[in-house]
Amino acid sequence: MKKSILMAALGLLSLNTIAQDTPKEEGFIFTTVKENPITSVKNQNRAGTCWCYSGLAFIESELLRMGKGEYDFSEMFIVHNTYLDRADKAVRTHGDVSFSQGGSFYDVIYGMKTFGLVPEEEMRPGVMYGDTLSNHTELTAVSDAVVAAIAKGCLLYTSPSPRD
């Protein structure tokens, strides 16, 4: 019995030695039909502002595709102004409007229409503490708490101007 088990095991192991290499097939080769120009890839780092980075990258690429020139708009300009606007709306509705880092493509369009656009050189990300990239960890923690405290407060009067 032991002999037959040993012979069966050796027989199975020998199958591995006579296996032949299969020829490797080449993968699918893509052919570029149309290549649109794009702007450089930006790093949002630790800021929940992907909505602004992707939205402005789309707009910059579309301007480039249409032959309108190469632009690098400031994401932080749109983010800064929309956060102020969101904070004002959250306070006026006593917290019934979402105040968070997230957003959508329409927030970029709204920011362009309402506040305009500026070049990246005018308002770079990470201008605090010598950083070169955005880090909104502290900003989010503080601004969420401040807006929530004001929104749930018992103030009877709110200034008509959000920037007063």
Per-segment meaning from a language model:
Residues M1-D21:
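Bacterial Sec-dependent N-terminal signal peptides
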Residues D21-V33:
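N-terminal regions that are enriched for targeting/export leaders
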Residues K42-D85, A90-E120, G126-V127, D131-L133:
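Active-site-adjacent structural elements in enzyme catalytic domains
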Residues P119-A151:
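Surface-exposed loop and adjacent secondary-structure segments within mature catalytic domains
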Residues C154:
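C-terminal edge-of-domain segments
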Residues Y157-D164:
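Conserved small/polar residues in nucleotide/adenosyl-binding loops
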